Amino acid sequence: MRGVARSPAARLRRRALIGALAVLAALPGVPGAVGASGEGTAQEAVATNFELIGHSPLDNRGMNAALAVHGDYAYVGSRTDGKPWGTELNLNDAGIKVVNISNPASPTVVGEIGPPDQGLTDQTSREMRVWSEQELLIVQNLSSNCSELIHYCSPTGGTPDVFDFYDISGENASAPKKIATYDPSSNPHEFFLWLDPFVPGRALIFISATSAGRLLVTDISGAREGQFRELGSWSVPIPSGDLHSMGISNDGMRAYLAHLTGGFAVADTSDFVEDLPGATGRLITPAARRVSWPGPGAHSAVKLFGKDYAFLADEVYGDALAAPAFNPPHGCPWGWVRMIDIADPTTPALAAEYKLPQNEAAFCDTDPPRPSTSISAHNPTLTPNLALITWHSGGFQAIDISDPAKPVSAGAFVPDPLPAVVQEDPALSAGADKIVMWSFPVIKDGLIYVVDVRNGLYILRYTGPHAEEVSSIEFLEGNSNLGDALRFEPPDPCLRSTPPPGTVCP
């Protein structure tokens, strides 16, 4: 595997470290051991309407992050950077794990993209997608958002936030080969991969430049030739918060903005899709009519397939990020889900909320402080009638959204945690709560792939209400319009000012 060769001595040191951690985790009073912090645990292990098919602990490294799946392989990024221990870099395995999933019951780590490409000091691989038609793995590397407090990361300010593109065709699937790098004009935070449903080979990435409050849109169609063209950078005119992320309609004409404390709004992104000179975005929802609530605010926004509703999720960390040190404050009761009626996108309205019991204020009144626990909604992937969402220490949740105004529980999966890992997440798993379901779920061939920050990659089968919807899916993820997304909500070519050639419009 490129960039990951280690000496026998280094491998022995790492095995010894994991073994020592396993022993320490069983001892009372040891920092980071289960039950040692005085915090209560969030949930017992449960599997309601989920069947565990396979699991990889990803070498017990901890600090796992983004997930991308293609063919017989899954790729798992890291929330932290590569730490130099002694004279060797990346002994905490902070690169991108390559996992063979040809047998979903036995996923196996077969390599890692490490130095000099990944797993560097001051670099985290927290966002990834696969452009399947081009067989390209897209890795968004973050440095500007690298912090000791949240990511156990060592910010130096010298590493740029870039997108790396890896060829994963043929033999490169198990040993990805870097072929191009794109350095955006603004530091990225998250991105949505959009493939033009009417122009084969055309792909855009919609980037939330959170620190700049901007939406940056870039044409990556020429990625294999190292060609990238920024179509526009729009300063979102919402007076508070920052653009954290956005969902994009299948036709690319609308964006559903998660603007942290600024809340939720709908935007027109047709300029970028039609590649107009001076392309920019425009708010369809006037800023004064946006839906907002107390911070930290909107983290993820996804439109429901075939329904005039948007699914909003917060992300809220533990009490260590509470007031007065942090504004807006984090902590109990953390974050949950809101269903927004967008039948009139100029005046969206809150239709319903969905919470776990731990997200009720009454729970906080009786619960001990949890400085490094988050029982918060995070990243969703939707089918027409289900929301599959990671909920940090609340595990992995299925929500029936067939009636968007009345979302109800459809299942939950909370595994037993690993005894020990190389690196606990300082903000999410350093206390007693050792489950941290984090990634966007990816559905491939009817099975669900999801990553826990601490405990690795899980492969699940959903067996609850609307199970046939999930089992029929070839590919679906919450942060692109790839695969079955187009089947669930076919785009209308006649909405473009210049419809594609051969289109017959009324």
Label every model-predicted segment.
Residues 1-6:
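Compositionally biased, low-complexity flexible segments
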Residues 21-24, 34-506:
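Feature marking well-ordered beta-strand scaffolds used for ligand recognition
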Residues 7-36:
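Secretory targeting and sorting signals
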